[in-house]
Amino acid sequence: MSILGVGIDILSILRIKRIIKNKLGTKFSQKILSNYELNILPNCKQNYTKFLANRFSVKEAASKALGTGIRNGLKFSDLELHHDKNGKPYLKFLKQAKKMLQAMNTKSTHVSLSDEKLYVCAIVIFED
């Protein structure tokens, strides 16, 4: 297996808190979350700020691993963060993200998230 793409992102949780405080939280949520994520948001076990911060960070990392960032038709909502029964994070690729991933001939994806009081960090790796 060889690495096809790597993306990493670190995010200040205070940045997300400021967005929410400035009454932009709902608009921001609708911009970065998929329909599935919007539906689970009210029932999330994490606090609202960390929920958004983790998703924003992992989607930024994934867009970097795809080699484009959020452009060329790729939207934040084309990526969904999920967790398996053990809590291990994984991504679902929808619409444009799915097309881009297939064009890279990606066979395996790896996701890791870490969050502390002030920061969230995400890394995404694609392999053939």
Curated annotation (Swiss-Prot):
Keywords: Cytoplasm, Fatty acid biosynthesis, Fatty acid metabolism, Lipid biosynthesis, Lipid metabolism, Magnesium, Metal-binding, Transferase. Its cofactor is Mg(2+). GO terms for molecular function: holo-[acyl-carrier-protein] synthase activity; magnesium ion binding. Disulfide bonds: none annotated. The keyword Lipid biosynthesis applies. One of its GO terms (cellular component) is cytoplasm. Its main location: cytoplasm. It is an enzyme of class 2 (transferase). Gene3D superfamilies: 4'-phosphopantetheinyl transferase domain. The keyword Cytoplasm applies. SUPFAM superfamilies: 4'-phosphopantetheinyl transferase. It is found in: Cytoplasm. Mg(2+) binds at D9, E60. It catalyses: apo-[ACP] + CoA = holo-[ACP] + adenosine 3',5'-bisphosphate + H(+). InterPro entries: 4-PPantetheinyl_Trfase_dom, 4-PPantetheinyl_Trfase_dom_sf, ACPS, Ppantetheine-prot_Trfase_dom. Signal peptide: none annotated. Its EC number is 2.7.8.7. Belongs to the P-Pant transferase superfamily. AcpS family. NCBIfam families: acpS, pantethn_trn. Transfers the 4'-phosphopantetheine moiety from coenzyme A to a Ser of acyl-carrier-protein. This is Holo-[acyl-carrier-protein] synthase. The gene is acpS.
